[in-house]
């Protein structure tokens, strides 16, 4: 396996997540968030010659990290199309799936992507820069009520209405284009002592809306349930409560949209067995080495 990579993204909860997959030598696995390839490399280390790994990523930058290995296939796509591409590759069942839902550190640190309030650049925030609305597009076109809903749902903010109103007023004067433009609008609404936390919530809400992240996560989980063989495992690393609640609920019930089945006693009839009833978090040592692992939570389930 060629281990060259254009950047050194540190994979979070690497051992814990791949251990959780219980990789079998000849199995078929999917890393739906390939990114820098860290988790994929570890899965390949544990796969035998007859096993295969599919790596999904919609970000064109991730293609620079593809390694040469006949056991690996890269799929340039959002993971919400998991079932479509597995069918295209004639894969009917998989033995395991891993997802690390965090935004790569290389993206946070790239001022041209607009993911972070720490770097001044254009407000883009798209994972796939070839299509879709940018963060600036949303701020300049969404109605005030739609902006309120976005900040309420995805940022869990208490002052969503005030922020949304200020955005609408500001864009009447001039178009919002850069991170600095946005920060200037937000300044009166961020309390001293909680600046970073509140800005992180606001930027999170905008990023989730730009990339339709929660909708994509739901779709991927539903498809993963259908693809996993009995005994196959799914390991998901989340970074905020919205994602974690979705994953926890899905592992418990196996559904989002359908009627949730219960037994005679009212217990959920889930297609999954929970492997770790307590979420797995990064050790103190890992947090020191990689501070962005601090908020990571790992949940693992096995298809019954």
Curated annotation (Swiss-Prot):
Gene3D superfamilies noted in UniProt: Putative methyltransferase TM0872, insert domain (1.10.150.170), Vaccinia Virus protein VP39 (3.40.50.150)
Pfam families hit by this protein: Methyltransf_5 (PF01795)
Principal localisation: cytoplasm
Enzyme category, top tier: transferase
Residues that bind S-adenosyl-L-methionine: 37-39, 57, 85, 100, 107
GO biological process terms, semicolon-separated: rRNA base methylation
Enzyme Commission number(s): 2.1.1.199
Compartment(s) of residence: Cytoplasm
One term of GO molecular function: rRNA (cytosine-N4-)-methyltransferase activity
GO cellular-component term (any): cytoplasm
SUPFAM superfamilies: Putative methyltransferase TM0872, insert domain (SSF81799), S-adenosyl-L-methionine-dependent methyltransferases (SSF53335)
Catalysed reactions, semicolon-separated: cytidine(1402) in 16S rRNA + S-adenosyl-L-methionine = N(4)-methylcytidine(1402) in 16S rRNA + S-adenosyl-L-homocysteine + H(+)
UniProt keyword list: Cytoplasm, Methyltransferase, rRNA processing, S-adenosyl-L-methionine, Transferase
Keyword field contains Aminoacyl-tRNA synthetase: no
Matches recorded under NCBIfam families: 16S rRNA (cytosine(1402)-N(4))-methyltransferase RsmH (TIGR00006)
Task of the protein: Specifically methylates the N4 position of cytidine in position 1402 (C1402) of 16S rRNA.
Family per similarity comment: Belongs to the methyltransferase superfamily. RsmH family.
Name used for this protein in its record: Ribosomal RNA small subunit methyltransferase H
Lineage of origin: Bacteria, Pseudomonadati, Bacteroidota, Bacteroidia, Bacteroidales
UniProt gene name: rsmH
